A protein has these predicted regions:
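Gly/Lys-enriched N-terminal cap/neck module of very large, oligomeric protein machines
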Residues: 255-304
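Catalytic phosphate-handling regions of large nucleic-acid enzymes and associated NTPases
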Residues: 2-252
């Protein structure tokens, strides 16, 4: 009787522990070249996207939002739900609905953080001077572009700026906005990235335009004659120091001190604080006063 033919066994390859085709090989190279080739491009990208605004005064997230609202017809039309704007903006900005809505809030009239807001808002958009006053969800609020945005998009359809592909190459978006005034100096802007941060204060729109026209006529124009000092939101008093102002204008670096405004209500025997510096919040000030009272450094305060 013929014997059954044996099937040859396949050779068993050694276990690779998930390493395929040399994926686990160690490549040695100088740390300097590694940083130059990988880290430096990343650092430059986030610095230009987060820390330093472009010449039009906007970061990419701002520009993508405003351009989306412009394409939606919100420059002249009625307000629409903020959720609609956020959803449309995600075609240009893939960072998620929460980040987009936060950007819209900070550009809105209701948030009160800008001298000249770009978003005409309706509903609860919180307040920049309150840490605990949260804004409503995007499904409850409405928005459109403010009238000043006419000066941001003027002649944008006449090849005044370059257009680039969005993140998935399905749409075009402007690399800059054709602003008709120095918006980078009109509204305050802050940002932080890799090893670099910026905190640009705001200036009066009329004074900025007059100064720009004067510099065009005379490059040696003394800026301080038409632009004496920054103009901050909230209406605080500036503690003017000519040396500091000169340093800010000449180097772009320096600090300007602000003082809150108040009035004494004699009938109620209380102090009414009318405005506070834009770099702090009501809650921070209240907590600081409470600490001073507990330490015995401030007395005769019964309520706050």
């Amino acid at each position: 009787m013929a014997s059954k033919k044996k099937t040859p066994q396949k050779s068993i390859s050694p276990k690779t522990h998930g390493v395929i085709n040399g994926a686990g090989d160690i490549v040695e190279q100088p740390i300097v070249s590694t940083i130059r080739e990988n880290y430096m491009p990343y650092a430059m990208s986030v610095i230009l996207s987060r820390a330093i605004p472009e010449i039009d005064g906007f970061k990419p997230s701002h520009r993508k939002l405003l351009f989306t609202m412009y394409k939606m017809g919100l420059l002249t039309g009625n307000r629409t739900k903020s959720a609609n704007i956020v959803g449309a903006t995600m075609k240009l900005n893939p960072h998620g609905d929460s980040a987009i809505y936060d950007t819209m809030v900070r550009l809105s009239r209701g948030y009160e953080a800008l001298l000249h807001p770009y978003v005409d808002s309706k509903g609860n958009f919180g307040k920049f001077y309150s840490r605990d006053m949260a804004w409503a969800a995007s499904r409850y609020t409405e928005a459109k572009l403010a009238p000043i945005c006419n000066e941001l998009f003027r002649d944008i359809d006449k090849d005044t700026v370059d257009f680039v592909d969005n993140y998935d190459n399905t749409m075009k978006e402007p690399s800059l906005l054709p602003v008709a005034f120095p918006s980078v100096l009109v509204n305050a802007n802050t940002g932080i990235a890799v090893g670099m941060a910026s905190n640009i204060c705001s200036f009066n729109l009329k004074e900025i335009c007059e100064t720009t026209a004067a510099l065009i006529r005379d490059p040696d124009h003394d800026i301080k004659t038409t632009l004496p000092a920054p103009d901050f939101i909230g209406g605080c008093q500036i503690i003017y120091d000519e040396k500091t102002i000169n340093q800010v204008y000449e180097t772009g670096r320096g600090s300007i001190k602000l003082r809150a405004k108040y009035e004494y209500d004699k009938s109620a025997n209380c102090i009414d604080v009318l405005s506070i510096p834009s770099t702090t919040t009501c809650e921070v000030i209240i907590e600081k006063i409470i600490d001073l009272v507990k330490q015995g450094k401030v007395k005769e305060i019964s309520d706050i």
